Amino acid sequence: TATRGSRKEFPAVAVIVAESTQLTIYDGDDPDMPMWMVFDLLGTVGSNSNMLPRGGSGQESDITSIDFLNSKLVVGLNDVNGTVGEGLVEVNFISDFGRVYREAGSGYTSAIYNLPVSGRNSNSSYSGDYDSLAIITQTINDVAMTVLPNAPIDSATGLPVPTIAVA
């Protein structure tokens, strides 16, 4: 399809390209580097949106930063007009879910996308509001991940849980 390549398994070498309103993962295992998966930004957290939300009219968010480690893709979003962005989105490819991190009290803080990764561009919605997992601001300029020594092991993946730094 236009947003999903023919290979099922995640490539050992992935090239991830972020444009302002689209994120594309290319299969670096293949010398032709075909598209493996595309995420389109659409909609607003709190109403219908894709797994990567774009934001409402006049408050559109662009991708500012990405990182990938241990099956987790994190995407930072920042409002193009300087107001509050849509936050930080985590996509977990092994556990097959998306989660958005936002400010406490913003509604939908650490909410889970209602569809698996295969439904990432389906204009669904997020559910839940967990202020205990809030971030300081929804305006994301940069993101990085690392696995710290003695990091806990994710029981679903068997991989160490990365620490996510957000600026």
What are these regions (language model features)?
Residues 29-59, 94-144:
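Surface-exposed loop and turn segments in beta-propeller and other repeat-based domains
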Residues 74-79, 99, 154-156:
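Generic local-structure boundary detector
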